[in-house]
């Protein structure tokens, strides 16, 4: 049996797809090949994502490939997947999640706490920018786009003091040795689904059940809880929004942030993990009442 897996062209996207292909090979001895696709989000690099407009900038072109039967499935970073799935598509599996934290990479290995006043920090994420300002209101936030390696190179090219990137992506492309600092998930709440990969298929695909074996239950329900939080707040790449769900002894804890009326609101909630979706919704409701 041969599967074609669609993914973005970036090195990180290809590495992430190789992770899924390796898991499939181990479980089912299935031969897979990658179909590389350049998405709208990949093509427009000079403009920040929130100004391009629309949802699913890194996903839609890949879904077209599945609709046209050029691919059997797709691998996404779950943080790129809109909470509303198009009709006929589903996330069939979410394997075990990687490190969810954000990392700081500086030019001369200077710790975040030791940055000079007015230091220039590169990020195009509204979520990261807002939380950086809460930690250090003096920081100068500089928008940067591009793949992981491109952003790292921009530290020198654009005379930045440092940049913020996801730990998971750095680990997957073996660049985590460059990390200067790790942000705690309470001081820098991650993006919805950060560190998690999702396998998307068409609901009618005859072999879709083969992917279900790759599902990691606790990782999946944590991501689904975060996505319920995002859905209730109608969040997307235009929003300053983040959430992180974790599980200990069947108890789920979720921390979430959202910008409302020009104010960053941060709330937490705890409950039994079988109520994961209700917890995400309840956390959003707490924020809306603030």
Curated annotation (Swiss-Prot):
Catalytic reaction equation(s): 4 porphobilinogen + H2O = hydroxymethylbilane + 4 NH4(+)
GO cellular component: cytoplasm
Family to which this protein belongs: Belongs to the HMBS family.
Cofactor, how bound (note): Binds 1 dipyrromethane group covalently.
Keyword Transmembrane helix: no
Gene name of this polypeptide: hemC
Subunit and partners: Monomer.
Enzyme class: transferase
Disulfide bonds: none
Additional remarks: The porphobilinogen subunits are added to the dipyrromethane group.
Protein name as catalogued: Porphobilinogen deaminase
Pathway in which the depicted protein is active: Porphyrin-containing compound metabolism; protoporphyrin-IX biosynthesis; coproporphyrinogen-III from 5-aminolevulinate: step 2/4
GO molecular function, one term: hydroxymethylbilane synthase activity
Keyword Zinc set for record: no
